[in-house]
Every structure is written in C-alpha cells, then in structure tokens.
C-alpha cells in the first residue's frame, strides 16, 4: 500500500472491522484517533503480523460444531498489483468454514460431503479485497485447479482468491424441489462456483424433509437474513474461502444476471419459475451451469449500496442472495443461518451466532445478527431485525433514519415563523406582551439573555431601526424600550432602589429593620432637618441652639454643606437629645435638601417674616411633604422692621400648612434667631410633635445601618464621611460599605471633635477609614467581612458607571445625523471640591446652563480634595479648565499648570462659579451676523468687453457702491441673482474704491446676464452683538 495507510484501508485489507483494528492498535500501545487516521508503515506491519495469529484461532476452529475435516488452504501469493495480502480470515465476524457433515446427518442420502473438497476446505486467509464471485462454469468440475492459481491471472478479477470446495447447498423450492442428479460435492473448475463450501444440516421444520430436502445456504449478508444491508464485496477472502462463497445470483427470472446488491451466489433457494435448476449435488439450483460469460463485474466503490437492501433471501448463496424466489436463502459467512426468502427465512449470522437456516416459507428459530444476536428474517416472516456491520463506514445497526415531519408540525413551524417579528430580515423572538426587567445601563447582551435570543440578531435589528450600538455597549432606557416594542416585549427598567435591594439580597443582606421585637426596640432621639430659603436664618438658628457660631465660617454667609449636630434640651424636667441637620438653602443644593428630607423625622421650615414665602421655601416644603414628615414652621426675624408673621401664615395656607390658631395641625412658632427669642418654645414644639405623631424606636443590638449625609477628602485623615446611624450600633472596627466606597471604621468623631467608640441610633458621627470618598446620600451598612464589603462596592461602582455611560450616549437618528456631524464648541471642565455634596451641587448647576446648541459643557472629571498633578495632566490632554471649589492646588500642581498653560479658577461661593462659566460659554458662541444695506445703483447701459466681460454703466441712486462688496441683481423688483460680488469699480477710466450716490460708475459683477434698467443692490454682513 503506497504511502501511509489509513485505518479503514487496513481494515479492508485484513478483512476485519475498523473498530477491531483500533482496539488492536490500542493493545499495541499505539493511539489512533479514528478510522480515517493514518498509521506509519512499521505500525501497519506489526498490525499485519498480529492478525494472522488471532485470526487463525478464530477462523481455523469450527465454531458451529461442524466436522473438522476441512484444512486451511495455503496462503495465496500476493497479486501482481502489489497489494499486501493478509494471512488471516476476518477474525471476529466469521468463524471457520463449515466442513461437510456426514451424509448420515442429512435427510438426503448421497455422498454430499465427499472427500474431494476436504483438502481444499476453507483457507483461513483473508484477501485485501473481496470481489464478487464468478459464476461457476461447470458445477461438476473439480475445484483443485482453481485453488492453485491466483485470482490475479483472470482478466475480470484483480484480487487473488483462495478457493473452497463447494459443499452442497440446496434451498427447498415451494414447488417441490428435485434432488440433483449429482449428490456428491464436485467442485467446479471456477472459484466463482464455490458458493457452498460448508454444509449446513437442514432444519427439522423444513417443509420438504427426506432425500428431496435441500439445505438453506448460510449467508449473513443475504437479503432478509437479518444481516446488515447488502453491499458489494469488500477486499477479503474469496468466495471459495467463505462459507457458501459468492456465486451468481440466478434464481427465477433473474437467473442470468448477478445480484446488484450483494453479488449473486449459487444459493440454496431457486425460483419457482425461471432458469434451469442446478443439480442437487452442486449445492442447490442456481440456474444453468456456470460459464465465463456469467462472471460478475469487478467490484468498485460505486457498487456500494446507498440504502439497506430489502429483506428476502436471494436464490444465490453468496454474501448476498439476489432478489430470489420466495424460499431462497442467501448463503452467509461461517456460522450464519441462511437468509430467509420472502415468505420467511432464517437469520443470517455475522459472528458465529446464527442457527441453521430455515426452509422455504418458514421462519428460522435462531436468527443471526450482529455478534450472534437474534436478527434476520424475511419481510413477512423473518424472526428479527437486520444486523449491522461495524467499521469505518457506519455505526452498528445501519444508518438511523430521521422521521419525516407531519403536516401539522410543518404547518405549526410555518405559522411560528410567520408570526415571529422580522426587522431587516432578522428573525427575532416573539414576546406575547411579557415583561422583561432590565437594569439601568443594560446592554443588548443582557437583553438577549433575558429573552433567550442571539445578541448579534439584536445588534442587526437595532441597526435597521437606525441605532448603531454594539452587543456589550450600555444603551439608554428608551433604546431598550424601542427594541422591546418591536418584539412585543414590555421592558421594565429596574429602579436604583430595587437594583440595590436585589444586589444586597444576593449576599443575604437586607437594608432595614428585619422585624425586631418590642423588647429589642428602644427609644431614640428625633432627627430634625432645618430647611428654608437662603438667608432666612437657618444656620443662625442652629448656632443659637448650639450656642456656637458656624455661620461666620461659611463663605459668603451661606451654608454650602450639610451640618449634623446633637443637642440636649429639657422638657418637663427631662433631658432630651435632638439631632439637627442643617441643609443649604441655595437653589444649587436641591439634592442636598432632598437627602435631608429623606433621612429626617421632623422638618423645621424657617421663613423670614419680612420676606415671606420664597421659591426655595416652596421647594423645601415640597421635599418635606414628599418624604411624609411632619413640619414645624419657625417664623424668623420677627424683630426686623417690616416683619409680618401673619402674612407668612396666610401664604403657607395655600400650600396646605394651616396653623393651629386657624384650625389646622401645623405648629407655628415666632422666633428671633439673633435675639434668641422663643428658642425653647421651638424645641418644645419639636418634641411634642415627635411624641404625638411618631414612634421613635430602633433596635440598637443589630448591625448598624444609616445614611452618609456628606463626605469629603481630608488632607491628613483621608476620606471622611459624616454618617447618621438609623438602626443598630456602629462601632470602631466594623466593616462598612457606603455606595461604591468601603472600608473599616478606624476612628469616629462627634460634633465636638471628640473620639467615640460607638454610635447609637440617631447619632451623627464622622467616620474615618473609607478607601474612597462616598457619595452624599449613599446608604451605609455594616457587613461581616471586608471581602463582602469590597464585592458590594465594586458591583455598585460598575452599575453606576454603566448607568452614566448610557445616559451620556445621546440617541442619534439618521435624520439628526447632519446636526451631530456639525462642529460644536465644547468647554471641558474638571471640578474639585472640598466635599462630595458641594461637587455634586456645582456640577448639577453648571450642566443646567443653556447658552445655545453650538456650545456644550462637558465635565470630564470630578473629585473631592485638592488639585493634584494628575488633574493637571488630564486637563493638558483634554484642553480643560480646572475649577477648585474651596480647595487649592497641591504640591507642584500649580507649577505644572503654569508650564502647560492650564487655567485654574478658584471659587468659594457657588453662584460666582456659575456666573463665570456661563460667561465663558457665551464667549465660545459663534458670532451672529446681520445684513446691512450699502447702496443701490440703476443700470443705464451695458457694455461687452472681451477682456473683462459684461460691464454695467450705472447711476448710484442711494448710498454708496463699494468694491468687493456683496451685491444682488434685481429686475422688476425680482431678485435675479444672489450672493454676487462687485469685482471691479471705476469712475470713468480710474479705479475707484467706492462711489457715492448721484455719481455715475462702471462696475462688473460675478454675473454676466445684466440688462438695462436692472437694479444692483450692495450690502455687507456685520456681527450682531449678543444680548
């Protein structure tokens, strides 16, 4: 075999299955992956040497209990084609050839098992290729000359064949078989007639017992024998070596042609009509005496069957009986029963398991099959199913057929495909109004996982909908809702609170009281938030209560931070603590006021008696009412000239705050924070309201939970967060997580700058130990270990970034694409502040500035702490302005900024920063121009010049005509041409820069169709100052 041999080629050559070759190679320590793999020449040589030993054992013995008179024939020399010939028969599937049984065992007398075929009995050698047997020319000629001559000498066959003497093989005929005139087994001169090398004793249930009852051939590959589908002969031992070798299938009407499925064989069965019966002594009738013209065609791969052969044994006894008569049984390999005919046949054996063949029209009690399993049988009466051939060309049992779809199934699939939405040719899943919950900033991959779809299909669908997004890109809520509506899904965006709750539940953590008993609950101080308009005296009121002066330390006299304090007051002789939270009143601190209202028990609304209700007063009132907290109104500045407390009561009545003296439930207290008037009455009103309307109890034994009111970056202490404990007790050493910041409590400081070791409910403290600055308003909670805190913080940070990316991405449709592509001026900012609440308020206020679509503001970075070198480096790369709010440049940052030309602006009052940025944005606007008319001239004459073109002789009737000015041409008060230019202007023969009204001039325009009496109007574009 030239080159490297493949496993299935070696299996053909050795006459075994590919599985056995693979097993043998594994035993030899060679790893081969599959039947199509190649093996090296030394490995193939060892494989060939190994198989005769094992094959001789299997093939030489008489596995079916036959007489051992047959001797193995000597091995054949290699044929002229150079193909190596294996020295062993097929090891597993075919036991030794049947030797002839004594004549006494047969129902038919005669020297059938004559001694002649004895020496030429089955040769236990296999041939590389098993060809279709040639028809026997003369059935009574001895087979001795044929076994000595290699098959390669014959012109119609390429492979050498070892011959076996034909044993008698007769199939009972339905019409009464006649015994052949030559009962003795006389081998024919041609190997093709060796179809019956072994004798099978007839079954007792044969319908024609006695001397006239022939035996059924034993061909495991006969149609209907329970063997695998018939196929053309493979390389291997010739028909003379096999039990019932291959002979011409010539039963019945097909007596003269070989069988197309498996090659005909002179089998036992004969057709009731058709060709002449062969003598009984020749092993069954197969037609006329064989002759060379009946040789089958040479085997080739094209003869492989494309589908399993039909059941029903052929009249021949070869590897496959043809489509023979009703009782014909195909001869098989050693050990196999005869293939049953159409009425019923025995099972064909594959590996020595088949019982004796059945007679015509009867089922075989023991069928062959794969490895001796029951199988075989004809179409109507066969006892079992087909066997199977294992090897490189298929799995055992034949190819599995896939059932055809029913019409109902096809119709249902068609209807499903018709109802499935198709966007741009992409099939999408159909949702029947189902709800899909997605988090903020989700990607198309997240959406596809929810609906079990392909993300690439959603990307393609979005492209056809005019949206260009990737599968992993965070997309906005409206894009997800648009895509969901196309597929009939209802997209629900998870709120940040629900998303955070689901995140905590994944760690078996719940935020809130898990349900403490009454014994565990203890009373706590009320948390009071002071709210109101700017400059109405909120901080002065707290200073008076605390007997401190905080207002003097605030820039501009306005509060720009949230301050938290706890004071002790007396009520009915008992000292009662009250926690106060001071919120900014400036309009920029809306978010701070909202956070203060959410984390409070009672809201104190401070209104100046001289100013009355102001816009921030209404806003603070709305925050308190939205949070559902009771309100106590403090009418301040009653000592100021022009104060009118009654007016304040009347105005607040419009906002559902009715004073008690007017029959309402809201307590009004007239105070003077500067003079300290009625402060005790205000504190008493706060405590009475808390006792009357609130159940102020908390469980101090649980793990601490609360809210971060504000946070900042301290230069010496790092991130510092002011937290308000709402439940539980916070202790030094606890692992805490607040928003996307986490850490371990290293130190806690109260409002008097004193260290404390624990903080009970309603106690505000400053916590040191966070790894980063938490966001103002973030909830904090204590967890078991740092690892859990880090994981929660990381997931929160990733969620926040995705939501920000989705919000930044503006939805751009194809109609708005031209606007997007226009060049716009952009002002980049870096904001650094002293605490997170101030930075948030400043950024929110700056982004609300609107000066036009041509200029936009972009905050590329924000942070808490001083301005450092990394901020300057980022500003250098992005051409950015750095804003420092209550902070300064650290270290060499100022020096680097001067060297790189980065502008740093420092602010301490928020509204000044807002004004400066608004002016800067207006300065970046493109100038606006307006048209200003210069003059008009009437065309009196038109001259043609080959050098300069058309010359208009004009009289200036109004204004001036100026060279290089813009002009338009009017004819009968209709604009003929626009955007023209006065290219030349002359007064007589002299060039002129301008010509005033009342003078004549000659001019040329960038337009040649000028006629007499046309009007030339000149104008110029002047920049229009912005309001």
From Swiss-Prot:
Comp. bias regions, Pro residues: 110-122, 174-188, 201-212, 293-302
Region: Disordered, residue numbers: 31-433
Example of a GO cellular component annotation carried by this entry: cytosol
CDD domains assigned: IF2_eIF5B (cd01887), IF2_mtIF2_II (cd03702), mtIF2_IVc (cd03692)
Annotated spans, G3: 582-585
Family annotation (InterPro entries): EF-G-like_DII, IF2_II, IF2_N, P-loop_NTPase, Small_GTP-bd, T_Tr_GTP-bd_dom, TF_IF2_bacterial-like, TIF_IF2
Sequence segments annotated as region (G1): 532-539
Sequence ranges of Low complexity compositional bias: 123-145
Domain tr-type G: 523-695
The entry's keywords: Cytoplasm, GTP-binding, Initiation factor, Nucleotide-binding, Protein biosynthesis
Basic and acidic residues biased stretches: 148-171
PROSITE patterns registered for this protein in UniProt: G_TR_2, IF2
Domain of life assignment: Bacteria
One Pfam family in the UniProt entry: IF-2
Region (G2), start-end ranges: 557-561
GO MF term (any one): GTPase activity
Biased composition (Gly residues): 57-68, 237-268, 311-397
Region (G5) location: 672-674
Compartment(s) of residence: Cytoplasm
Keyword Signal: no
Residues that hold GTP according to the record: 532-539, 582-586, 636-639
Keyword Cytoplasm: yes
Region listing for G4, in residue ranges: 636-639
Job of this protein: One of the essential components for the initiation of protein synthesis. Protects formylmethionyl-tRNA from spontaneous hydrolysis and promotes its binding to the 30S ribosomal subunits. Also involved in the hydrolysis of GTP during the formation of the 70S ribosomal complex.
Similarity remark: Belongs to the TRAFAC class translation factor GTPase superfamily. Classic translation factor GTPase family. IF-2 subfamily.
Protein name in UniProt: Translation initiation factor IF-2
Taxonomic path: Bacteria, Bacillati, Actinomycetota, Actinomycetes, Pseudonocardiales
